[in-house]
Amino acid sequence: MAQIQFARGLVEDAIPTIRLTRSRTGDSGTATFYFESPNIFADEQTQEVTGMYLIDSEGEIVSREVKGKFINGKPHAIEAILIMNSPDEWERFMRFMERYAQEHGLEFTKA
């Protein structure tokens, strides 16, 4: 049950592109998520974006660094950044991503 939400209770169906960076020492890292045409922007949705919530069997990882991208005044995409400040946070994120990838038929590729 690995899922991503931008508003509590509204599961995001759009599959993101994710870019990972990690410090040379492994002490910190970032994950940049890009969601094109997320369902939070669907016409029938009235909830506002309150953050990015990565939810799985271990609990929840939260990022408040979420930005909307607009084209011609209409919402088009969401970019969210998750900052990991310790090796434990990195490992926790990777466990979430393994579950999310497995449930959504995704795979990891190095750039």
UniProtKB/Swiss-Prot annotation:
List, alphabetically, the Pfam families matched.
Psb28
**InterPro entries, A to Z:** Psb28_c1_sf, PSII_Psb28_class-1
Q: What is this entry's stated membrane topology? A: Peripheral membrane protein
Its localization reads: Cellular thylakoid membrane
In the record, biological process GO terms are: photosynthesis
The SS bond pairs are: none
Q: Which GO terms describe its cellular component?
A: photosystem II oxygen evolving complex; plasma membrane-derived thylakoid membrane
Q: Which UniProt keywords apply?
A: Membrane, Photosynthesis, Photosystem II, Thylakoid
**What family is this protein classified in?**
Belongs to the Psb28 family.
Q: Which HAMAP family match?
A: PSII_Psb28 (MF_01370)
Q: How does it assemble?
A: Part of the photosystem II complex.
What is this protein's record name?
A: Photosystem II reaction center Psb28 protein
For this protein's source organism, the top of the classification is: Bacteria, Bacillati, Cyanobacteriota, Cyanophyceae, Oscillatoriophycideae
